[in-house]
Amino acid sequence: MAVIYWDRSKIVWSFEPWSLRLTWYGVFFTVGIFLACLSARYLALSYYGLKDHLSFSKSQLRVALENFFIYSILFIVPGARLAYVIFYGWSFYLQHPEEIIQIWHGGLSSHGGVLGFLLWAAIFSWIYKKKISKLTFLFLTDLCGSVFGIAAFFIRLGNFWNQEIVGTPTSLPWGVVFSDPMQGVQGVPVHPVQLYEGISYLVVSGILYFLSYKRYLHLGKGYVTSIACISVAFIRFFAEYVKSHQGKVLAEDCLLTIGQILSIPLFLFGVALLIICSLKARRHRSHI
């Protein structure tokens, strides 16, 4: 049986006297966020009908978007960390509270990151509602919903490189044997579930970006956000079935993992938003 053996170093650079380390996960995380922000800014400036808006200049819009992306990290990362602490390691962090801020030891939840982003989008749109009224909550979330897959792909690629969030054992020819996995069994071929997820997110996001970029379909406000939320929840829910769950279940007899439980509210939010947007679009068409 042909398998892939993964034995790459997790460290790019280290300075032992000060215990400083640059990990490949950190590199992929940074590159993914940076490329996603660049793509979103380009899309907003060129293809979302803003460049001809008379109430503000293109440079003002560029600065506003850059501020939005830069400061979003202050909500995404803490949100991801807090959700991980609460849902994935509460008993441990209750005994070792000093570890909560030691984010370099690992431990981020994508669901918490999404919640942190949505909170920041709401705050930012409120701050800018008089300066640039076009930057509404749904505009910002639609914009990022078109490019989220870029960041998600690189983050999952970082997980793969870091040998974490590994899959369950498999006999498929593309099974991966990790030399030093953070979970699961060493020396056993497993599903490269990190790549399953990352590629799926990238495909969904690519389709949404293409539709927004080419404007082949007239997607109204909120549609990209709702489709992105539904897709992410769907992908994450089923990816959990081939993940090594590290005991992250609500109880021994529970059929769902915490990752699946947390995906349900995201799915419901996406469905509710899709229904609301569809009803508004229908009412709008009836008045034309």
Swiss-Prot record:
GO biological process, any: lipoprotein biosynthetic process
Pfam families in the cross-refs: LGT (PF01790)
Keyword Repeat: no
EC numbers for this chain: 2.5.1.145
GO cellular component terms listed in the entry, alphabetical order: plasma membrane
Protein origin, superkingdom: Bacteria
Subcellular location: Cell inner membrane
Transmembrane intervals: 18-38, 68-88, 107-127, 135-155, 193-213, 222-242, 256-276
Mode of membrane association: Multi-pass membrane protein
Residues engaged in binding a 1,2-diacyl-sn-glycero-3-phospho-(1'-sn-glycerol): 156
Isomerase in keyword set: no
Purpose of the protein: Catalyzes the transfer of the diacylglyceryl group from phosphatidylglycerol to the sulfhydryl group of the N-terminal cysteine of a prolipoprotein, the first step in the formation of mature lipoproteins.
Family: Belongs to the Lgt family.
This protein's name: Phosphatidylglycerol--prolipoprotein diacylglyceryl transferase
